Swiss-Prot record:
UniProt cross-references to PANTHER family, sorted A to Z: GH08155P (PTHR46473), LEUCINE-RICH REPEAT-CONTAINING PROTEIN 55 (PTHR46473:SF5)
Cysteine pairings via disulfide bonds: 38-44, 42-51, 200-227, 202-249
Keywords from the named record: Cell membrane, Disulfide bond, Ion channel, Ion transport, Leucine-rich repeat, Membrane, Repeat, Signal, Transmembrane, Transmembrane helix, Transport
Assembly, per entry: Interacts with KCNMA1.
Protein name stated in the entry: Leucine-rich repeat-containing protein 55
Matches recorded under Gene3D superfamilies: Ribonuclease Inhibitor
Span of the signal peptide: 1-34
Gene designation per UniProt: Lrrc55
Organism listed in the record: Mus musculus (Mouse)
Length: 298
């Protein structure tokens, strides 16, 4: 009897039980990997990494490689290291609003070819350099609003962003914006430029003319865009200016104007010669009169 039991095969676990064990082990490994790849103070779920409102002074060093949506909003981040986005090829949304950024490193978006939405509002950016968004050709929305120190946008800052639809430059420190910075954006639909200290001189005319020609396609916050100068148009709505407002920028001289200038020049020349002649005669007479008086005294 003992030998009979020894020869019988030991019953193995059911097939379904093996599958259950394998599933639990795999789930544990996946959970462990996800846990180690999610930065401290951040939450990671469904390719969304949320590190907002954590009082961070620097960006988290490691993110899940498949991150699509990254929020670093409402922190105290002052700088983003060069090449920070190099490994995150799936990134679609980057939210850096309400931080302390003064500038971004060159080539930050060089590998962010799928980035579509970028929020840099409420920072301390002072300028937008040339090729800042180089290779980020998928950008659809850029928010640069509420950067009070933003004084300059390079004419080639948005070069190559053919898919850009929404651009917010409101509430900055811009007094001038080059037409070249915008005319290379064929897909632009919404442009926000209100709340800036615009100087509505002759250099502003090309931009205004371009906006008027695109008014059906480009919505601008006309109620908030006002002129800060020159004094004669201070406080005037930017879009209330007409071609008549820039008439002085296109003053041209006619033939009659040139003839009048030539005539005035001729008269001034004759008057100058006559004046010099009279002064010479007067000086000569005074000299002779003085000499005659000296001879009489002798």
């Amino acid at each position: 009897m003992g030998d009979t039991w020894a020869q019988l095969p030991w019953p193995g676990p059911p097939h379904s039980a093996l599958l259950l064990v394998f599933f639990l082990l795999a789930a544990g490994v996946m959970h462990s990997d996800a846990g180690t790849s999610c930065p401290v103070l951040c939450t990671c779920r469904n390719q969304v990494v949320d590190c907002s409102n954590q009082r961070l002074f620097s960006v988290p060093p490691d993110l899940p490689m498949d991150t699509r949506n990254l929020s670093l909003a409402h922190n105290r981040i002052a700088a983003v290291p060069p090449g920070y986005l190099t490994c995150y090829m799936e990134l679609r949304v980057l939210d850096l609003r309400n931080n302390s950024l003064m500038e971004l490193p060159p080539g930050l978006f060089l590998h962010a070819k799928r980035l579509a939405h970028l929020d840099l509002s409420y920072n301390n950016l002072s300028h937008v350099p040339a090729d800042m968004f180089r290779e980020a050709h998928g950008l659809v929305h850029i928010d640069l609003s509420h950067n009070p120190w933003l004084r300059r946008v390079h004419p080639q800052a948005f070069q190559g962003l053919v898919h850009l639809r929404d651009l917010d430059l409101s509430y900055g420190g811009l007094a001038f914006l080059s037409l070249e910075a915008l005319e290379g954006l064929p897909g632009l639909v919404t442009l926000q430029i209100g709340g800036n200290p615009w100087v509505c001189g002759c250099t502003m005319e090309p931009l205004l003319k371009w906006l008027r020609n695109r008014i059906q396609r480009c919505t601008a916050d006309s109620q908030l865009a006002e002129c800060r100068g020159p004094p004669e148009v201070e406080g005037a709505p930017l879009f209330s200016l007409t071609e008549e407002s820039f008439k002085a920028c296109h003053l041209t001289l006619t033939l009659d104007d040139y003839l009048f200038i030539a005539f005035v020049g001729f008269v001034v020349s004759i008057a100058s010669v006559a004046t010099n002649f009279l002064l010479g005669i007067t000086a000569n007479c005074c000299h002779r009169w003085s000499k005659a008086n000296e001879e009489e005294e002798i």
